[in-house]
Amino acid sequence: MIGTILAVGFGGFLGAISRMLTSSFFNKIIPHDFPYGTLLVNIIGSFLMGLFFSYASSKGVHIFTKSLISTGFLSAFTTFSTFSYENLLFLQSGDYFHFFLNIILNVILCLLAVWIGFLIFK
């Protein structure tokens, strides 16, 4: 049990750092009127989650590895709380276009990404 807990913690540490670096990179190269960094991190993370679980279900990956990658790394890499906060800011500023666009893009593109990732090893 302690090994699994440490795996989740280490994976989370790496996932959070990766999210910060990836999101910051995309926010620097794409204009700031929309939270593209968060959107792209969520799409990438969703794709990787689908890819990993498709592979894991076909290859029988050990629980330690599942904990490290899915519960640890990928859960820390994607960010629903930031997505929610950015939507709150859009609502508070009356920017309903970006509010709805952000929700629609995150839900549809992340669902599509996890599905595509899953199909790769199916």
Curated annotation (Swiss-Prot):
It catalyses: fluoride(in) = fluoride(out). It is a multi-pass membrane protein. The keyword Membrane applies. It is found in: Cell inner membrane. Keywords: Cell inner membrane, Cell membrane, Ion channel, Ion transport, Membrane, Transmembrane, Transmembrane helix, Transport. GO terms for biological process: cellular detoxification of fluoride. Belongs to the fluoride channel Fluc/FEX (TC 1.A.43) family. This is Fluoride-specific ion channel FluC. It comes from Campylobacter lari (strain RM2100 / D67 / ATCC BAA-1060). The lineage of its organism: Bacteria, Pseudomonadati, Campylobacterota, Epsilonproteobacteria, Campylobacterales.
